Amino acid sequence: MRKGNPKQIHDWNDLIKPGVSVITPNPKSSGGARWNYLAAWGYALHHNNNDQAKAQDFVRALYKNVEVLDSGARGSTNTFVERGIGDVLIAWENEALLAANELGKDKFEIVTPSESILAEPTVSVVDKVVEKKGTKRGGGSLPEISLLARRSGNCREKLLPSARR
């Protein structure tokens, strides 16, 4: 979100307040945006005693506050960071870290909601490719963004046993 948190956004319920402009990718075209949608849905279910109608109303109110619905996560990050649109960006942790650390540490801050989804995308390593490119690191290979997050000290990522080889 914008530095200083001028709209006082601390959790999912703050995103449905009037006057809050949300940026998130379209869950119909972005895999990551589906996790955003499901995290909001899970929060709404939990805080409404599993009442699906109330959860649907919550998610509908959230998406009414979405100013730009980009087709993908990086597009939403660009809309928020480069175009300056929106009060808050709903994003995967790596996109939030990219915005804060690489594109404007003095302009953004990260707020972690009380509830979210733990998504653990799989990573495949093609030995011939990593050997040829010299990208194999420390007995295993991780995506560059994961390494960036680890260096920043903000990553809560856990490595699965299969990723520790």
Model-derived segments and their meaning:
Residues 1-46:
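A conserved helix-loop-strand patch within extracytoplasmic ligand-binding domains
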Residues 4-7, 27-32, 94-97, 115-118, ...:
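Solvent-exposed loop/turn segments at secondary-structure junctions
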Residues 6, 27-34, 53, 71, ...:
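Soluble non-cytosolic domains of exported or imported proteins
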Residues 13, 38, 42, 60, ...:
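Solvent-exposed, polar/charged alpha-helical surfaces in well-ordered, non-transmembrane soluble domains
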Residues 14-17, 31, 81-84, 102-104, ...:
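Extracellular/periplasmic catalytic domains that process cell-envelope and extracellular macromolecules
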Residues 20, 119-123:
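Small-molecule pocket liners
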Residues 47-114:
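Ligand-binding pocket segment of bilobal, Venus flytrap-like solute-binding proteins
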Residues 130-165:
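Extracellular/periplasmic juxtamembrane helices and adjacent flexible linkers that interface
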